[in-house]
A protein has these predicted regions:
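Long, charge-rich boundary regions
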Residues: 163-196
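Iron-sulfur-associated redox domains of electron-transfer enzymes in respiratory
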Residues: 1-161, 170-171, 176
Length: 196
């Protein structure tokens, strides 16, 4: 599924995600299919209110049209994320979250779960895909989706069949779990992943 809608994660999930994190910059997608008003979708303010109620410092926020457009998003975010920002939180479908995670120098988290709504599609401007599984794993995996990027859709780690960083099913494809581990290691988050 390339085009999805999204809902804010439950208050309990958000509180768990925010535990131990502060100095948050919030990025929200302005949505690519606003004419379809069949579901209520969250924006920056929905998440920001929850974070501030937990005493979290918001370093800033921005809404971006077509957040999944990496070139445009990179230009928009350049120089916009304030110094001192420790985490980026994205209010978007999985496509936007993956795009921001690829660009951000700090850990990126999603405040939403993506849902599949048949017939209500936006205009994804990326080769990335979102499974719209309604239980987003991107917070645990550094913004790399194990459902769509792993040929076996494994959610609890590598299968052990990868060779030289390539998938055993599709040798032209990088192993998603090796990429996940490398990103988490770069962000100093491997222990956090192992304790989930």
């Amino acid at each position: 599924m390339d085009y999805t809608k999204y809902v804010l994660k439950s208050q309990e999930e958000l509180e768990g995600m925010l535990a131990g994190k502060d100095n948050l910059f919030v990025v929200a997608c302005n949505k690519c299919f606003k004419e379809f008003e069949t579901t209520q979708e969250p924006d920056c303010g929905c998440f920001t209110a929850i974070a501030e109620a937990q005493g979290k410092h918001i370093t800033g926020s921005v809404k971006v049209d077509f957040l999944c457009n990496k070139v445009q998003t990179e230009k928009t975010l350049a120089g916009l994320v304030p110094e001192g920002t420790e985490n980026v939180v994205v209010v978007s479908c999985g496509l936007g979250v993956q795009t921001v995670a690829d660009l951000a120098a700090v850990p990126t988290f999603t405040a939403t779960n993506s849902l599949n709504y048949v017939g209500h599609h936006g205009m994804a401007l990326t080769k990335k895909t979102c499974g719209a599984c309604a239980q987003c794993y991107l917070n645990a995996t550094g913004g790399i989706c194990p459902i769509v990027d792993c040929s076996k859709s494994l959610v609890n780690g590598q299968c052990g069949g990868a060779k030289n960083g390539k998938c055993e099913i599709d040798p032209k494809k990088d192993c998603a779990w090796e990429k996940i581990y490398q990103r988490l290691e770069k962000q100093g988050r491997t222990k956090e992943f192992l304790h989930q």
